[in-house]
Amino acid sequence: MACGAAERGPEPPAFQRHLEASTQRLAHGYGLRSMSELRDQEFGRLAGTVYLDHAGATLFPQSQLTNFTKDLMENVYGNPHSQNITSKLTHDTVEQVRYRILTHFHTTPEDYIVIFTAGSTAALRLVAEAFPWVSRSPENSGSHFCYLTDNHTSVVGMRKVAAAMSVTSIPVKPEDMWSAEGKDAGACDPDCQLPHLFCYPAQSNFSGTRYPLSWVEEVKSGRRSPVNAPGKWFVLLDAASYVSTSPLDLSAHQADFIPISFYKIFGLPTGLGALLVNKHVAPLLRKGYFGGGTAAAYLAGEDFYVPRSSVAERFEDGTISFLDVIALKHGFDALEHLTGGMVNIQQHTFALVQYTHSALSSLRYLNGAPVVRIYSDSEFSSPDVQGPIINFNVLDDGGKIIGYSQVDKMASLYNIHLRTGCFCNLGACQRHLGLSDEMVKKHFQAGHVCGDDVDIIDGRPTGSVRISFGYMSTLEDAQAFLRFISTIYLRSPSDQPVPQASISDAGALTSKSDCHSPQEGSCTDPSVCNGSYPDTNIMDLHPSLSKASSAQQTPQDKAAGILNGDPGSHIVTNIYLYPIKSCAAFEVTKWPVGSQGLLYDRSWMVVNHNGICMSQKQEPRLCLIQPFIDLQQRIMVIKAEGMEPIQVPLEEDGEQTQICQSRVCADRVNTYDCGENVSRWLSKFLGRLCHLIKQSPHFQRNARKTPKKGQPPGTTVALSLVNEAQYLLVNTSSILELQRQLNASDEHGKEESFSMKDLISRFRANIITKGARAFEEEKWDEISIGSLHFQVLGPCHRCQMICINQQTGQRNQDVFQTLSESRGRKVNFGVYLMHSYLDLSSPCFLSVGSEVLPVLKDCGVS
C-alpha cells in the first residue's frame, strides 16, 4: 500500500453543512478562482503534501518568485547609500515599499515609521535596547517591563536587556490581564512620567488565541494596567503571528511598537522583518552603537557623532537587505491578486480552522473517550478571538497522552507536515499542559531541551502538536488531516492483543525465510572473507588467518545447527554493512572490525548540490544503489538497475584529495569528494545533482555516548558516518513478533504481506541474532561475540525509514504504524552497541554463527 493511500477512516463531516450551521458568515476560497486551480497554478510543488505549519512559515506562490526574478533580471539595483543612478532606483523603490507596508496596515508616514530589521526577533531586541528605561534607584522604583506569559521566547528574552538596565521585569498571566480592567494605576500620580513597557501578542503562536486589540488603548490610557505602578505605559503589540492571516488596522489600534516578520505573510523573503514605530514615541528612543549609513556626521579620532534625522535611517545599521525589501513589493502584489486582500484570507482560514476544530473535538473512541485534547482559550466562535491554529495532544482510549514525537512520525508517513514541541512559547506551554516551573527544570535535568523529541517524562507531556492554516490551505488539507487522525488513532492498541513469540517459533526461522543466505555480492571469496587482503590505513590487519578455519564447519552450517539445537542460545545469523549511508546493504558472513565498527560501514554518503547528506527520507531510491566491497582489489563497486557498474577506490591518494566539511546528525565531519565520474553516475540514476563523499581517514568523529565499562574515564569512541552508535543489533524473534502483528493486520484490510527478509532489511541492522524471546535484547546491558565485547547503549528509536521496502524503494506505513501500536505507541526496535574495549593488535572479525553471550541489566548472564 503506498504511503498516503492508507485505508480511510471515518469520513469528516460535510463542509457545506458546517458553513450553513456556523454563526459566522464564513467564506471558503477567493471568488471565481477555485482553490484547486490556485494550488495547481501557484503551489504545484505541494502535490501529494499536506502542509499544516503556516504559523511556522507560510509558502510563496510561483508568480511571486517569477515576478521578483524578472524584476532583478530587468533592473540594476545598487547600494542605496551610493549616489549613482542605480542606487537612486534602489532608494526610491525601498521608500515605496515602506509606504506600501504602512498602507497595508491602514496607516500613513505621518503616524508610523518603518524600520527594517533582520526579523521580528531583531525588532524586539531593538526595542529592548532603545526603550528609554529608567533604572531603579533609592528615589524611584524605576521602569517596569511587563509581558504576557503567553508570548514568544523573543519577547521574554527582552528581560535580559531590561535587567542589565536595573529594570524590573514582571510576567503577567492572561487571566490576570483579563481581570486588570479598572486598575487605574496612573491616576494616583498623574504627573508621573516614568516609562513602562507592556508586551503582548495579537495572536498566540501556541494556541491561536487572539487577545483584544482594545488592550492597546486601554493600557496606554491607564484603564487597564498589567501591574499597579504609576507612570506612563507604552505598548508593544507582537503582530508577527497575527498579520500572517488577518488585517491589522493601526489607525484604530495605535500601538507604540509593532514587530512583524515578512516570511510569515509572504513565504519569502526570509530573514527580513520590520519594526513599526509610532511617531510620537520615536523621539524617546535611545541608541548606543552606530553603523554605516546611520550618521549625519562623525569623527574617527574624537567622540563626535551626529545621527541622521530620519528615524528609520538612524536605526538601520549598515546596508539594509535591499533586494529582499524589493521582493516585498511582489509579495504584496501576489497576495492582493490571488486573494483580494487580508479580509478574504481571514475568512478563508477561519472557515477551515473552525471546521477542523469542530470535527477534531468530536472524535471519540468506542468507549466514548475523546481522541484529542485541544488547548485553547476560545470556542473557535469568531476570528476576533481565534486564529487559524489548533494546538492539541492525541490521547489513547484510556485517556493517556500519546507523545507528540510519535504523532509527528506517524503524520510524516502520510506526508502531513505539522509542528510539535512548545513552539518557542514556554509560558503558554506550561499553562495549558499544567507544567510547573519545578517540572520544567526537572525535565531539563532529565535531558530534555527545547526542540528535541523527548515528548513524555514521568507520564507527563513536554509539549504538544500544532496545525495551522495559510491562505493557500484547502478543505482537502483539513480533511486529509482528519482522516489521518481517524485512521491511525481510532484503532486503539488496547483492542489489539499482542501475541508473544514462542521459543519454537524463533527456531523455525530457517524454514520460513531465506534471510540466512547472503545476497548476491556478499563476501564469499575466502581470500577476502578470511582476511587475505592488503593492509589499510584504518586498521592493521595481518594478511592471513589460520588455514585450519577452512576445514571447520562453515558459518552457515553453524547457524543452522544452533538454530535447530539449544533453544535458549543466541547466535549471529546475519552480518550487514552499509558502505554508503542510506544505500543498500552489503551482506557478509565474516568481516573485519575496526576502531569505528565494521570496516567501511557507512564510510561514504551521498550529498545534494548544497552538500547536505541525503537519506531515504528524502530520496527512497537510494536503497536501490548497491555497493560491494572488494578488499583484495581495494575498490568499492557500485551497481544499480539500468546502470553500468562503477568503481570507487577504498582509499584516495591523500595528497590529491581536498578536504571539505560536512555534517552528520549535527556533528561536523571532514570528508573528501570521490570525483566527478561517480557524481555523474549517481546524478543520472537519482535524477538530481549529487556527489559521493567519504569520511577522511585522518579525522576522528567522537561518539557523544561513551561506554560506561571497560575503558578509563575520558576515553573517546570513534564513529563513522553513522547516526548514533557503531553497531545496531536486531533480534529475529523480535522481527517474527512484528511479522505476526502485520499478518494479523492483514485480516483488517492491509494490502501487503511482509517476508522476514523484507522486514530484516527495513531495520538496516549490522548484526542479526537469533534469540529465544522477542525484545529480550532491550534487557541486555552488555554482550560478547567471540573475543569482542560490546556495551548496549539502548534502544533504537525508529523513524519513517522503516516504511521503505529496501528492494523496491516503495513506501508503506503499515510497519511503522503496527510497531507503534503493538509496543504501546513506542517505536523502538533493535539496540545500539559500542565497543566496551577493543584490542586491534591482532585482527578482529565478526562471523555468522558466533555465539552471543548477553549480560542482563543489573543481573547476570542471560
UniProtKB/Swiss-Prot annotation:
One of its GO terms (molecular function) is molybdenum ion binding. Its EC number is 2.8.1.9. The modification N6-(pyridoxal phosphate)lysine is found at K264. SUPFAM superfamilies: MOSC N-terminal domain-like, PK beta-barrel domain-like, PLP-dependent transferases. The keyword Transferase applies. Residues 704-855 form the MOSC domain. Keywords: Molybdenum cofactor biosynthesis, Phosphoprotein, Pyridoxal phosphate, Transferase. PROSITE patterns: MOSC (PS51340). The active site is at C424. GO terms for biological process: Mo-molybdopterin cofactor biosynthetic process; molybdopterin cofactor biosynthetic process; molybdopterin cofactor metabolic process. It comes from the Eukaryota. The modification Phosphoserine is found at S34, S517. Pathway: Cofactor biosynthesis; molybdopterin biosynthesis. It catalyses: Mo-molybdopterin + L-cysteine + AH2 = thio-Mo-molybdopterin + L-alanine + A + H2O. Its cofactor is pyridoxal 5'-phosphate. Belongs to the class-V pyridoxal-phosphate-dependent aminotransferase family. MOCOS subfamily. Sulfurates the molybdenum cofactor. Sulfation of molybdenum is essential for xanthine dehydrogenase (XDH) and aldehyde oxidase (ADO) enzymes in which molybdenum cofactor is liganded by 1 oxygen and 1 sulfur atom in active form. This is Molybdenum cofactor sulfurase. The lineage of its organism: Eukaryota, Metazoa, Chordata, Craniata, Vertebrata.
